[in-house]
């Protein structure tokens, strides 16, 4: 019998993308609430408890409510795509390539917290350098990022695409999170193995899907003897043996005139780059991904597949 999967919030941006990725699969059975019954709390609870894996694509409070509904049913495993549980030690963090043991933790977990889009890029760049002893304690990490507007869900999609929307956004690019208290900062700090919260400056561009995350570093403030080449080598070693996260060779990065935020649109992979001048004193680490791919729905399906393989 095929495992039953219920996407709670299947009509939202992330939920719809998950359904698209699972279309045509015969190895799982998708449970679904008829659209006319979407507000039926009893039916929702029944669906949650009938699933082998429930994928929650909900706001934080609604996710917490859903987890309570299945807390006594050990037959139900959960993948949550909100920020509610990402730094909860009782939940496996759903970034399988984060370190060598993470995929096995996800396979064995009952509860998996799907990573945020920005943290996927930031942690993907930072954690290997912390693990290798290159990025020292106390380093003032800065993360700058731009996302496609679908990361803001249906409301922002309407604001960006409908010029008649009462709160339409006409700017081609805008900063937000200006008080430096973005909800992804704790996640970056904990899973990036940082002892000091990074300064995070997010922004949105007038493109639907895609993301660039940047972490600039001063080499003189890193471990003694660190070079652009040694940083690249540490990243390459960290991600060896898998094909989801790739580290672009230095020669290929050097040949680039620009990085295109939408290059990986529709894909569930991530590319990492190390930019700088050989022998120079600075580097810029860059992660490229689809905010709805490896940054959300693609990661959720990847985590589901790992859990089903356990």
UniProtKB/Swiss-Prot annotation:
Which biological pathway?
A: Amino-acid biosynthesis; L-arginine biosynthesis; N(2)-acetyl-L-ornithine from L-glutamate: step 3/4
**Reactions that this protein is recorded to catalyse:** N-acetyl-L-glutamate 5-semialdehyde + phosphate + NADP(+) = N-acetyl-L-glutamyl 5-phosphate + NADPH + H(+)
Active-site residues, Swiss-Prot/TrEMBL: 117
Q: Single GO molecular-function term?
A: NAD binding
Database matches in InterPro entries: AGPR_AS, AGPR_type-2, NAD(P)-bd_dom_sf, NAGSA_dehydrogenase, Semialdehyde_DH_NAD-bd
Output one GO BP term: L-arginine biosynthetic process
Against Pfam families, the record matches this protein to: Semialdhyde_dh, Semialdhyde_dhC_1
The listed locations are: Cytoplasm
Gene3D superfamilies membership: Dihydrodipicolinate Reductase, domain 2, NAD(P)-binding Rossmann-like Domain
TM region(s), chain numbering: none
Coiled-coil regions in this chain? Answer: none
Q: Which SUPFAM superfamilies match?
A: Glyceraldehyde-3-phosphate dehydrogenase-like, C-terminal domain, NAD(P)-binding Rossmann-fold domains
Q: What is its EC number?
A: 1.2.1.38
User: What is one GO cellular-component annotation here?
Assistant: cytoplasm
Q: Which UniProt keywords apply?
A: Amino-acid biosynthesis, Arginine biosynthesis, Cytoplasm, NADP, Oxidoreductase
Q: What is this protein's function?
A: Catalyzes the NADPH-dependent reduction of N-acetyl-5-glutamyl phosphate to yield N-acetyl-L-glutamate 5-semialdehyde.
Tell me the protein family, please.
Belongs to the NAGSA dehydrogenase family. Type 2 subfamily.
Q: What is this protein called?
A: N-acetyl-gamma-glutamyl-phosphate reductase
């Amino acid at each position: 019998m095929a495992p039953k999967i219920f996407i709670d919030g299947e009509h939202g941006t992330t939920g719809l993308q998950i359904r698209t990725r699972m279309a045509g699969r015969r190895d799982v059975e998708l449970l679904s609430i008829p659209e006319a019954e979407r507000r039926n709390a009893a039916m929702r609870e029944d669906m949650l408890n009938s699933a082998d894996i429930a994928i929650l694509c909900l706001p934080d409070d609604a996710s917490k409510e859903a987890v309570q509904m299945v807390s006594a049913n050990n037959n139900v495993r959960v993948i949550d795509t909100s920020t509610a549980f990402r730094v909860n030690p009782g939940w496996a963090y759903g970034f399988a390539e984060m370190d060598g043991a993470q995929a096995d933790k996800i396979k064995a977990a009952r509860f998996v917290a799907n990573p945020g889009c920005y943290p996927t890029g930031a942690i993907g760049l930072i954690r290997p350098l912390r693990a290798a002893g290159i990025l020292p304690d106390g380093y003032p990490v800065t993360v700058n990022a731009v996302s496609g507007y679908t990361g803001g869900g249906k409301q922002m999609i309407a604001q960006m695409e409908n010029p008649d929307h009462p709160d339409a956004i006409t700017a081609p690019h805008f900063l937000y999170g200006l008080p430096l208290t973005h909800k992804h900062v704790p996640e970056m700090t904990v899973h990036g193995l940082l002892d000091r919260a990074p300064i995070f400056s997010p922004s949105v561009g007038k493109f639907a899907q895609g993301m660039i995350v940047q972490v600039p570093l001063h080499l003189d403030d890193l471990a003694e003897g660190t070079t652009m080449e040694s940083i690249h080598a540490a990243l390459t070693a960290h991600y060896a043996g898998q094909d989801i996260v790739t580290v672009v060779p230095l020669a290929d990065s050097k040949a680039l005139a620009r990085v295109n935020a939408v290059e990986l649109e529709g894909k569930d992979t991530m590319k990492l780059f190390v930019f700088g001048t050989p022998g120079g004193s600075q580097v810029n680490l860059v992660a490229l991904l689809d905010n709805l791919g490896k940054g959300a729905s693609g990661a959720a399906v990847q985590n589901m597949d790992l859990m089903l393989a356990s």
